[in-house]
Amino acid sequence: MEQLYFTEEHKMLRDMVRDFARNEVKPLAQELDERGGFPHESVKKMAELGLMGIPWDEKYGGTGMDTMALVIAIEEIGKVCPSTAATMMAHTSLGTAPIAVFGAEEQKERYLPGLASGKKIGAFGLTEPNA
């Protein structure tokens, strides 16, 4: 099935992210989990690799890759550290996507370059009664 869905670009991304996850993320995962820490170092390196801007238009500093590429990257990171993968996923889908999809052009120009580059981290706020 891989041949039906994965382009050569997807395979290269998968291999690169797999190596990164095993060599850079995995060694930090247990200690971060035990102390409830945020993966600052991993997020910085993910930003340097362009992973924080995978689905966003190059016009705004993203990679211009497709959603499948994003899923591949999240899956590979999630194999070694679900928390780090969740950080990337929340940044992209909850923090950045609303601006990229529904934002006015002015908002996109203002916020997406920082988010796509990973210089800023997208977040999501939720409140519930009695929380």
Q: Where are the language model's segments positioned?
A:
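Extended amphipathic alpha-helical segments enriched in small hydrophobics
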Residues: 13-18
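Intrinsic disorder at enzyme termini
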Residues: 1-9
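Glycine-rich flavin
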Residues: 12, 25-131
